[in-house]
Every structure is written in C-alpha cells, then in structure tokens.
Amino acid sequence: MAILGLGTDIVEIARIESVIARSGERLARRVLSDNEWAIWKTHHQPVRFLAKRFAVKEAAAKAFGTGIRNGLAFNQFEVFNDELGKPRLRLWGEALKLAEKLGVVNMHVTLADERHYACATVIIES
C-alpha cells in the first residue's frame, strides 16, 4: 500500500457554536450525512459533535487533494465508529467515485478534541 494523501484540520468549537446560533440547523444539514444528522439531533453535545465531524470532513477533503468542490460535498463523507469505537469514514456520491478512481483501499482517521478545539487527521492509502 502507498499513501495517497494526508489531511489535517482544526476547528474552533466556539466558531461552530456561533454559526449555529446565527443560522440554526443549516450548517449541520449541509455538513452531516443522514445518519450523522439523526445522531446530532439527539446528541448530548451537538456543537462538539458537529465540530468534530466538520474537522474530519475538511481533513478528508485535504487528503484527497480536492477540497470541497467539483461535486464533492461535506455530507458525502460520513464519520462513524467501528465496534471498538474507532472513527472511520464511509463515502457516498462523488466522494465514493473519486476514491474508486484513485484506487483508495484504506482510510485512517484520528480525531481529538479539547475544551476549545476539535482536530482531525485523515490518511488515505491505495
């Protein structure tokens, strides 16, 4: 296997909170997949949940070398936890097509948050 890309992102949690205060659920609707949306709606820390998902998706877009453009959207990158609680990525739509085109066979996700920040790193392998 070879590393195709590496992306890292850091999000100020207060910034996400500010956007939610101004625009309600619009940011969450744009960023989250349907499965993530269902979790967010009942999560005990919805702002922190959204900030962490946003960081992973930005990191993934950077790892793919594309950013969020040309048909790619945040909600095409879905963060979920495996049976051990490890964060993983599931792709949909154009993100999945891009991964198939690039020959992606594995994606590694690491995620951390502290009081003020959430950060994530994504590595993609072929």
UniProtKB/Swiss-Prot annotation:
Residues reported in the UniProt entry to bind Mg(2+): D9, E58
Q: Which UniProt keywords apply?
A: Cytoplasm, Fatty acid biosynthesis, Fatty acid metabolism, Lipid biosynthesis, Lipid metabolism, Magnesium, Metal-binding, Transferase
Q: Required cofactors, per record? A: Mg(2+)
Q: Which InterPro entries match?
A: 4-PPantetheinyl_Trfase_dom, 4-PPantetheinyl_Trfase_dom_sf, ACPS, Ppantetheine-prot_Trfase_dom
Q: Which GO terms describe its cellular component?
A: cytoplasm
Q: Which reaction does it catalyse?
A: apo-[ACP] + CoA = holo-[ACP] + adenosine 3',5'-bisphosphate + H(+)
| Keyword Cytoplasm applies | yes
HAMAP family, alphabetically?
A: AcpS
What protein family does this chain belong to?
A: Belongs to the P-Pant transferase superfamily. AcpS family.
Function (record text): Transfers the 4'-phosphopantetheine moiety from coenzyme A to a Ser of acyl-carrier-protein.
Spell out the protein name for this chain. Holo-[acyl-carrier-protein] synthase
